[in-house]
């Protein structure tokens, strides 16, 4: 199948934002203007095309990132809609992994919000070029210039306006395009009657000031333009666009534009910006991975290269079963062909290939380099797996997902539904890597764990709707961790003699605190422990670390060196050394000043001035640590770190304290030591 558009005309981009910044509405408008939708879907009435799960339509928030294909000015756009709610950071993470660029949507009255920061950091991690769209310019309290300064202050991003608004709040009429030096004014609510005019006299001075600042910023990123600028020569529109594109792709500049998606003002200009300034698959570095020998390998975005693709999302479709959303980095994937899942070392048959438009689909014979689509019929592929050619295998870097911070016990309302619930939970866990489920061996209860209360609410809701399993849910439990504070040396000998073959294992370890992942170092010399038993000691330590000695929580941030030990010619076995390893770990931990850690949430609360004292007092009583305050549009924004255990039911408490006028958002930030009194309380509760 011949390409409809060449690779340099592809734009794979995501729309990322804080909840309620108007991300889904913006995507809907893009689909409207690119000619796919005839009637615009509104999130307000639950009819939005992108929000295709029932729960999303009811709650008005986007949960599943749907990949949608559309066309604009001879370019193919693949849009990934990402959720802005903190409990769904995993969706954002996995979509950023496969994007080439992104549009960050800000709410004109709030600027940068907590989730904007989280998403921005994730985009930094993957080096995703971004442009900034300041939405809701028609809302009361809208302030474009304040928004831009929040990007500079809080995100430390070089935000450069390439438009400035004409009017704001109910008088928002359009914008001045600083590159072309014209005013764009809207005369209707569908964005159809849009006229280019001379810049109004009262804006001439401001436009001149911001245009000069923009030209200087673009020139700073390009040596040739800098020379022209310093010589006082005129820089042409084409040169400005080319310079801005180069600087945006290099992450040196974040171009800023404005609009109101709901009022259909500025969306077409934003799509033009995506085409003009965000990268094509040819503008980004070759994708890196390793071959089967573990050596570094890379693939360029070209149809002639061997196939390499990443399955970035698994979804269950009511009609066709399992869909694997996939980004093709190089080569061509054809329906009916066989490929290698190099992550799992298994051969897979590509069933049907479809391009997704929100939740309708168009079947295609092949997906080429740079394209995004969904594969039907894969048996063994899960999120983060690489699909590649069998002749030239490559394993692309997989994705990292955060561990859950909250868990609840769950049971079906009828005994008969137990098996059905187990199968449903397994299916949901396959779709969402931050959702985990297991059985508590002591109580026999099924436990589900995720990134927040809303995350688990939606899982329970999906069990009921999609799998027809109604459940009773226990009280939420915090995922505490344990760690150590000092370096120690400890040993353990496991010896059993009872006629016949005995058991013997002896290990001496040094254990110390460390930042980051668990490290095991083998420092045995002179064969004190035979090589084949070393991994058993490591396994014993890792298994024992799943149940710390304070309250049975997972132990993190420690390093172990196996320094000495002894063995018995006849009685030693892997099992004996595994037990010795786990005993040595417990002995070491009891001496190493163990402490309990709890998840700390970054909380941002917006309240009217008159409730501030009461709300701050309440945050302090929840063991919160104030980080700062800021007055925004007549309200106070309070920032603090608060332990997750103190935040359950906070929404209700805040509502009653502020007569329903306070709002808050929170996102997991880090783990911190628990005060002694709380540690004793948690350990006591666990022992009951």
UniProtKB/Swiss-Prot annotation:
Subcellular localization: Cytoplasm
Annotated protein name in UniProt: Elongation factor G
A molecular function GO annotation: GTPase activity
Pfam families assigned to the protein according to its UniProt record, in alphabetical order: EF-G_D2, EFG_C, EFG_III, EFG_IV, GTP_EFTU
GO cellular component term, pick one: cytoplasm
Residues annotated as domain tr-type G: 8-282
Keywords in alphabetical order: Cytoplasm, Elongation factor, GTP-binding, Nucleotide-binding, Protein biosynthesis
Keyword check for Secreted: no
Positions with a binding annotation for GTP: 17-24, 81-85, 135-138
Organism: Clostridium botulinum (strain Alaska E43 / Type E3)
Any one GO biological process: ribosome disassembly
Record function comment: Catalyzes the GTP-dependent ribosomal translocation step during translation elongation. During this step, the ribosome changes from the pre-translocational (PRE) to the post-translocational (POST) state as the newly formed A-site-bound peptidyl-tRNA and P-site-bound deacylated tRNA move to the P and E sites, respectively. Catalyzes the coordinated movement of the two tRNA molecules, the mRNA and conformational changes in the ribosome.
Homology family: Belongs to the TRAFAC class translation factor GTPase superfamily. Classic translation factor GTPase family. EF-G/EF-2 subfamily.
PANTHER family in alphabetical order: RIBOSOME-RELEASING FACTOR 2, MITOCHONDRIAL (PTHR43261:SF1), TRANSLATION ELONGATION FACTOR G-RELATED (PTHR43261)
InterPro entries for the chain: EF-G-like_DII, EFG_II, EFG_III, EFG_III/V, EFG_IV, EFG_V, EFG_V-like, G_TR_CS
Taxonomy of the source species: Bacteria, Bacillati, Bacillota, Clostridia, Eubacteriales
Main location: cytoplasm
């Amino acid at each position: 199948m011949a390409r409809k558009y060449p690779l340099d005309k592809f734009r794979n981009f995501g729309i990322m934002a804080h909840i309620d910044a108007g991300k889904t509405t913006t995507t809907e408008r893009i689909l409207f203007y690119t000619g796919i939708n005839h009637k615009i879907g509104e999130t307000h009435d639950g009819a939005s095309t992108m929000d295709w799960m029932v729960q999303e339509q009811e709650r008005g928030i986007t949960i599943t990132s749907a990949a949608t294909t559309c066309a604009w000015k001879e370019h193919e756009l693949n849009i990934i809609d990402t959720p802005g709610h903190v409990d769904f950071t995993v969706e954002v993470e996995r979509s950023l992994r496969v994007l080439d660029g992104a549009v960050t949507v800000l709410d004109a009255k709030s600027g940068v919000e907590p989730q904007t920061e989280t998403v921005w950091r994730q985009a930094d991690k993957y080096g995703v070029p971004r442009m900034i769209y300041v939405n809701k310019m028609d809302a009361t309290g809208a302030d474009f210039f304040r928004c831009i300064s929040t990007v500079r202050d809080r995100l430390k991003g070089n935000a450069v306006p390439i438009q400035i608004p004409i009017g704001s709040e109910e008088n928002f009429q359009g914008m001045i395009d600083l590159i072309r030096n014209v005013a764009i004014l809207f005369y209707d609510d569908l964005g159809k009657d849009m006229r280019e005019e001379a810049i109004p006299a009262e804006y001439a001075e401001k436009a001149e000031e911001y245009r000069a600042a923009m030209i200087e910023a673009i020139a700073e990123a390009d040596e040739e333009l800098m020379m022209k600028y310093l010589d006082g020569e005129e820089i042409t529109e084409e040169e400005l666009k080319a310079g801005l594109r180069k600087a945006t792709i290099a992450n040196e500049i974040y171009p800023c534009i404005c609009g109101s998606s709901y009022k259909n003002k500025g969306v077409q200009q934003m799509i033009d910006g995506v085409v003009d300034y965000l990268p094509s698959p040819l503008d980004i570095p070759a994708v890196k991975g390793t071959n089967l020998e573990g050596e570094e390998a890379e693939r360029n975005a070209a149809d002639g290269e061997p196939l390499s693709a990443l399955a970035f999302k698994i979804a269950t479709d009511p009609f066709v079963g399992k869909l694997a959303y996939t980004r093709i980095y190089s080569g061509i994937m054809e329906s009916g062909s066989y490929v290698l899942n190099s992550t799992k070392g298994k051969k897979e048959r590509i069933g049907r290939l479809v391009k997704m438009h929100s939740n309708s689909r168009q079947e295609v014979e092949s997906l080429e380099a740079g394209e995004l689509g969904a594969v039907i019929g894969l048996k063994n592929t899960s999120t983060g797996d690489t699909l590649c050619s069998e002749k030239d295998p490559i394993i692309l870097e997989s994705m990292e997902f955060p561990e859950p911070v909250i868990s609840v016990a769950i049971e079906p309302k009828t005994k008969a539904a137990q098996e059905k619930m187990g199968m449903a939970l397994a299916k949901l866990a396959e779709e969402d890597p931050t959702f985990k489920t297991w059985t508590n061996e002591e109580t026999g209860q099924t436990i589900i764990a995720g990134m927040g209360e809303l995350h688990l609410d939606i899982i329970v809701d999906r069990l009921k709707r999609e799998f027809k399993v109604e459940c009773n849910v226990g009280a939420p439990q915090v995922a505490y961790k344990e760690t150590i504070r000092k370096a120690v040396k400890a040993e353990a000998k496991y010896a059993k003699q009872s006629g016949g073959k005995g058991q013997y294992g002896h290990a001496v370890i040094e254990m110390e605190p460390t930042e980051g992942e668990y490290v095991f170092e083998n420092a045995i010399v002179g064969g004190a422990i035979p090589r084949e038993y070393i991994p058993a000691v490591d396994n014993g330590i890792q298994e024992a670390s799943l149940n710390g000695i304070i309250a049975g929580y997972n132990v993190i941030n420690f390093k172990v060196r196996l320094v000495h030990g002894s063995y018995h010619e006849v009685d030693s076995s892997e099992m004996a050394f595994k037990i010795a390893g786990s005993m040595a770990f417990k002995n070491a931990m009891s001496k190493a000043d163990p402490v309990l850690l709890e998840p700390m949430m970054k909380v941002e609360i917006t309240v009217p001035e008159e409730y501030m004292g009461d709300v701050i007092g309440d945050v302090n009583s929840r063991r919160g640590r104030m980080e700062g305050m800021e007055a925004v549009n007549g309200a106070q924004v309070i920032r603090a770190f608060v332990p997750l255990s103190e935040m359950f039911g906070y929404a209700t408490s805040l509502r009653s304290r502020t007569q329903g006028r306070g709002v808050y958002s929170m996102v997991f930030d880090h783990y911190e030591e628990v005060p002694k009194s709380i540690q004793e309380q948690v350990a006591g509760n666990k022992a009951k």
